[in-house]
């Protein structure tokens, strides 16, 4: 029930040809191919940028490991609970 038989594909092809026309189908296929090429080239460009950023971060972490910077810690006390802000809710009688 989940797969389409060859007859279903043939009927689907006829409907597509009738809807879009035989002249517009090659243009649509060409446009789709061009869009896919652009998409793939953008993906490759993003992957190459990601690799260069990763290598730059690796070099940066190596240099920071060689020269560690001291960090000064400070103690922070939690605020004291106040009686004003919190009151018990009482049901209305």
From Swiss-Prot:
UniProt keyword terms in alphabetical order: Cell membrane, Membrane, Protein transport, Translocation, Transmembrane, Transmembrane helix, Transport
Listed Polar residues bias regions: 53-75
Question: Domain of life of the organism in this record?
Answer: Bacteria
Region feature Disordered, mapped onto this chain: 45-93
An example Gene Ontology biological process: protein transport by the Tat complex
Q: Which GO terms describe its molecular function?
A: protein transmembrane transporter activity
Any one GO cellular component localisation term in the record: TAT protein transport complex
According to Swiss-Prot or TrEMBL, what is its membrane topology? Single-pass membrane protein
User: Does Chloroplast show up as a keyword for this record?
Assistant: no
Mark the transmembrane ranges.
Answer: 1-21
Q: Where in the cell is it found?
A: Cell membrane
Which InterPro entries does its entry note? TatA/B/E, TatA/E
Gene3D superfamilies reported for this sequence: 1.20.5.3310
What function does the entry list?
Part of the twin-arginine translocation (Tat) system that transports large folded proteins containing a characteristic twin-arginine motif in their signal peptide across membranes. TatA could form the protein-conducting channel of the Tat system.
Which PANTHER family does the record associate with it? Answer: SEC-INDEPENDENT PROTEIN TRANSLOCASE PROTEIN TATA
Subunit description: The Tat system comprises two distinct complexes: a TatABC complex, containing multiple copies of TatA, TatB and TatC subunits, and a separate TatA complex, containing only TatA subunits. Substrates initially bind to the TatABC complex, which probably triggers association of the separate TatA complex to form the active translocon.
Q: What family is it from?
A: Belongs to the TatA/E family.
* Name under which the protein is recorded: Sec-independent protein translocase protein TatA
Species whose genome carries this gene: Mycolicibacterium paratuberculosis (strain ATCC BAA-968 / K-10)
